Structures are given as structure tokens and as C-alpha cells.
Amino acid sequence: MKSILFILLSVFMAMAFNLQAQNDTLNNYDEKNRKHGTWVKKYSDGQVRYKAEFDHGKPVGTTKRYHENGNLKAVMDFQSSGRVFTELYNKDGDKQAEGFYHERKKDSVWTFYDENGRIVAKDSYTKGKRDGKSLKFFRNGDTSNIVPWTDGKRDGKIRQFFDNGKEKLIGYYSNGKLKGPLTIFYPSGFKKVEGRYKSNLREGKWVYYDEEGDTSKVINYIDGKPENEEQLEREETKEIRELENNQGKFDDPRNMLYERNRRNQRRR
């Protein structure tokens, strides 16, 4: 009887140690119970979740994280300066973004890629907040959108372009609000709309042009309200709607990449 119990206990302990080995491999602590040396964590099926190096509780060297399908998810290079250069990948193994973290916040320039490795956007950060120019690009690499940021708020001259290189829109932000002149163009280069904003509201005379460059309509605004509502309904443009509807929204390139990946998954 004792022999049987001993055998069962041995088998149980072996299974327990095997399970531990699958999920926590080479995981060590120093005398103060801080992570130290090589650490490997695994998913329940034994697939590696991440590999990392620690020096008395502090991550050092290169950390690699993996998706459950085994493809690379992230590579993090911990530098002596305290900054961490990071590369992020989707489940198919395509690089989606790269840039620096400092104190767990995005810092300096981050670059975002599509599934074919083309750059789709670049953002500048300071201590986790957008600070500097935010750029978007067409598939051919030409710039499609320029938005300046200061301390996490849109601030300065914004520009949009057609894929032929001509300007599509010029406007201005001040401390996160639309302020000053706005001009929208046709692909031909002729003006389409001309007006002004004051604290996010349309103000004064707004002029609408036809594709030949002739004035088609003039609407006067007071505190964001047109004198003639029917004229507004007819002359509303897609560019103006997008500009005003995006107020207060944080346009993160990762959202655009996520939607693209989801569409690609549906096609398969």
C-alpha cells in the first residue's frame, strides 16, 4: 500500500514540476526577492510568452514578447539612459510601430507601418503627450496630413494634401481649438471654401466657390450659427464635417492599423 502511495505521490510531483517548468522557466530572484537573471514565461500550452533579463529587479538588455501563435509581439531594448526602444508587431508578424518609451511613456518620434512595411504615420511625443508634428503619408510615401501639437493639444498650422501633392486644406489651431482662417481647395488648386474660426465656431463671412473658381455662395456666421440654415445644409462639405467632428478626439495611428488588420482578417 505504501509503495502505491509513494508511486502516486512521485507521479503527482513530477507532473507538478513539469507544469511549473512549462509556465515559469529559469525564473530567479535575488536575496531581496527581486527578479534577477533570465526570466521566461509561457502560455498554458507551453508556448513562450516572453523572455527577459533582469538585474536585481531592473529590466536590462532585450526583452521579447510573443503572441500565442508564436509570432513576435514586441521587442524592447532597455538602455542605460532609462529609455526603452520598442518595436511592436501584429499577430501575423508584421511590424506595426517603433519608438521610445521613457518612464513607461512614449517619448520622441514614433513611426507606424502598414502590413507591407510602408510608413503610414509619424508622431512626436514628450512624456507621453504629443508634442511636435504629427505626419500621415500616402502609400507612395508623400505626406497627406501635417498637424502640430503642443503639450498634447493641437496647436499651429494644419495642412492636408491631395495625392497629387497639391494642398487640400489649410487651417489653424490654438491651444486645441480651431482659430483663424480656414481654406479648402479643389484638386485643381482652385479654392473651394474660405472662412474663419473663433474658439471652434465658424465666425463671419464664409465663401463657397465652384470648380471654376467663381463664388457660388456666401454665408455669414455669428457665434457658429449661419444666418440662413437652408444655405448651410446645401453648402456643407465633407472636409469641414471631418474637421469639426474630430474636435477633442485623439487620432492614434494604432487605431487605423487595428481597423486595417481586422479588415484583412475578415477577407481570409
Describe each model-derived feature in a short phrase:
Residues 17-268:
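Glycine/tyrosine- and acidic-biased, solvent-exposed loop/turn segments at the edges of beta-strands
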